[in-house]
Design a protein with these regions (language model features):
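N-terminal pre-domains immediately preceding structured catalytic cores
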Residues: 2-202
Length: 202
C-alpha cells in the first residue's frame, strides 16, 4: 500500500516537472524575445528598447529639406527635395501634454539648449531634491534652485515645442517636445535651417 502511494506521488511530481519545463518557453516571462519598455524591466537589463528603425543617408544628397512627423508611428521622416534620406524613432508628448499637429517650420536652432520650464529642483551641492518639475506648477522647496533639463540639438517649431536629443523609452513620454536619439538629432540639426518646414500628423 505504502509502496503504491509513494510510486503515485513520484509519478505526479515527474509529470508536474515536465509540464513546468515545457511551459517555460511559452511563458513570456521566460522568453528571450520579451522586450521591456521603460520604467520597470522585470529583471531584464536596464535600458530603452533597441533602436532598429533610425538611419541617416542624407550627407551626400542635395536638395531642400523638410521633416514629416507621424505621431501614431512615433517616427520622423527627413526629406531633401522629396527624397527620403533619414528616419528616426521618437518619443513625443504623453497624454495630456500632447505634441501639437499641423504645419510648422523651424524657428530657432540651439545646439546646447536648456529648458526654462522643465527640470529639477536641486540643492546648493547640485543634489536633486525634487526631480522632473514644471516650474509653472511645482513649488520650489526652500534652499533649492531650478536646474533646467538639457535639450541638445534643439530645433524649435512652435512656442515651447521642438525636436531635440532625449531619452526614448519606447512610447510617448515627453512634455510635448519631440525627443530623438542623439545621433539622429545631430544629423537633423546640421541639415535644417530656420524656415525648414515641419509637418506633424496624427
Amino acid at each position: 500500500m505504502f509502496h503504491s502511494l509513494f510510486s503515485n506521488f513520484l509519478g505526479a511530481v515527474a509529470i508536474g516537472f515536465l509540464f513546468f519545463t515545457a511551459g517555460c518557453g511559452e511563458d513570456p516571462r521566460f522568453s528571450a524575445k520579451t522586450q521591456y519598455l521603460g520604467g520597470v524591466y522585470g529583471g531584464a537589463p536596464a535600458g530603452p528598447p533597441r533602436d532598429t528603425v533610425s538611419y541617416w543617408d542624407g550627407d551626400s544628397v542635395q536638395g531642400k529639406p523638410s521633416i514629416t512627423i507621424r505621431l501614431g508611428e512615433q517616427r520622423a521622416y527627413f526629406y531633401k527635395s522629396g527624397v527620403l534620406v533619414g528616419v528616426s524613432q521618437l518619443s513625443t508628448g504623453r497624454e495630456g501634454l500632447n505634441t501639437p499637429y499641423g504645419h510648422f517650420s523651424v524657428t530657432q536652432k540651439d545646439v546646447n539648449h536648456v529648458s526654462s520650464l522643465f527640470g529639477d529642483y536641486v540643492d546648493s551641492a547640485g543634489n536633486v531634491v525634487v526631480p522632473n518639475v514644471d516650474i509653472t506648477k511645482d513649488p520650489k522647496p526652500p534652499g533649492t534652485h531650478f536646474r533646467g533639463t538639457p535639450m541638445p540639438y534643439f530645433m524649435r517649431i512652435v512656442s515651447g515645442t521642438g525636436l531635440h536629443a532625449g531619452y526614448l523609452p519606447g512610447y510617448p513620454a515627453s512634455h510635448g517636445c519631440i525627443r530623438m536619439p542623439e545621433f539622429m538629432a545631430e544629423d537633423f540639426f546640421k541639415s535644417v535651417s530656420v524656415g525648414t518646414p515641419v509637418t506633424i500628423t496624427n
